[in-house]
Curated annotation (Swiss-Prot):
Enzyme Commission identifier(s): 3.5.2.3
GO CC list: cytosol
Species of the source: Shewanella amazonensis (strain ATCC BAA-1098 / SB2B)
Name of protein: Dihydroorotase
Purpose: Catalyzes the reversible cyclization of carbamoyl aspartate to dihydroorotate.
Length: 342
């Protein structure tokens, strides 16, 4: 197969950052994505509806296409049910994000104990606002490769049981444990999967030298977990959909003694997913994963127009502009076999 026409996809998890980076991140995100769930972990975080709408306007100011950002509230111990109701009424905010405090980039203001937000989760269940979850515990005694599994066992399973009417997305899943949990849960639980977790495992990051641009959170796992993710993404299950978790950091912040977590894939998101699906002999499953399952779960219409993927190898630039700096993308300087036609 050398040509694919797909309903325009959406990205159900992306980091656009802010300030002078926005012009570059919005350009890449909006090149062929119809919509994107925009992460709220700015500095300061997007904790109010007012802040979310202001961020929406900053993003739209840099968009020359019909690209539509879907906004997310950042949950803290102090988030109120009234804020949830205001978010739902805004028409711009579609979800709220649970970051366990300290779990990832700019998450220090996150939730210290999920019991602190049970009133908020009840309001979300009543209002129909989705809960997005970074599923890792933060206990320093827990091995970093086990933090997703422990979070599911100790925290998420209880939330799912206590709020059966709450739609929950376990974001950027990385383990067989997460796949099994999502598959066994009700129709109100789904998951996003990144392209880099489908294409790579921890050997790519650590064997033969440390490759900092593969360092992300949740961290890449062993290849058995990678295979479980591939099986889930290509299974045809409606519970799994595209979320790049594309997370730009300036080159000097990645290539450092203590480098930041995050991989940049927005420059070639659909192309990278196509490679993963092609390797599994499942290109026929790509459209549902990229274009149908996400909007169906969110209760939004599917995009009406299409994009074309062609088998046309191209070389990824060594870097892309990121405001006054540069970002090194996944596959920098390497060949990608698929290309979205402009």
């Amino acid at each position: 197969m050398t040509h694919l026409t797909l309903t325009r996809p959406d990205d159900w998890h992306i980091h656009l950052r802010d300030g002078d980076s926005l012009a570059d991140t919005v350009r890449d995100a909006g090149r062929y994505m119809g919509r994107a769930i925009v992460m709220p972990n700015l500095v300061p975080p997007v904790t109010t509806t007012e802040a979310a709408i202001a961020y929406y306007e900053r993003i739209k100011a840099h968009s020359s296409t019909a690209f539509e950002p879907l906004m997310v509230l950042y949950l803290t111990d102090k988030t109120s049910p009234d804020e949830i109701r205001a978010a739902k009424a805004s028409g711009k905010v579609v979800a709220a994000k649970l970051y366990p405090a300290g779990a990832t980039t700019n998450s220090d203001s996150g939730v210290t104990d999920v019991n602190n937000i049970y009133g908020v989760l009840k309001a979300m269940e009543e209002e129909g606002l989705l809960l997005l979850v970074h599923g890792e515990v933060t206990d320093s005694a827990i091995d970093i490769f086990d933090r997703e599994r422990i979070f599911i066992e100790n925290i998420l399973s209880k939330v799912v049981a206590d709020f059966p009417g709450l739609k929950i997305v376990l974001e950027h899943i990385t383990t067989k444990d997460a796949v099994d949990f999502v598959m066994s849960a009700g129709d109100n639980v789904a998951a996003t999967i990144t392209a880099h977790h489908l294409l790579y495992n921890r050997n790519h990051m650590l064997a033969g030298g440390i490759r900092p641009h593969f360092y992300c959170l949740p961290i890449l796992k062993r290849n058995t977990h990678q295979q479980a993710l591939l099986a889930a993404a290509t299974s045809g299950s409606k519970k799994f959909f595209l979320g790049t978790d594309s997370a730009p950091h300036a080159k000097d912040k990645k290539e450092a003694a203590c480098g930041c977590a995050g991989s940049y894939t927005a420059h070639a998101a659909l192309e990278l997913y196509a490679e993963a699906f092609e390797a599994e002999g499942a290109l026929d499953k790509l459209e549902a994963f990229a274009s149908f399952n996400g909007p169906d779960f969110y209760g939004l219409p599917r995009n009406a127009d299409t994009v074309a993927l062609v088998k046309s190898p191209w070389q990824v630039p060594e870097s892309y502009p990121l405001g006054s700096t540069t970002v090194v993308p996944i596959r920098a300087g390497e060949i990608i076999g698929w290309k979205v036609e402009d």
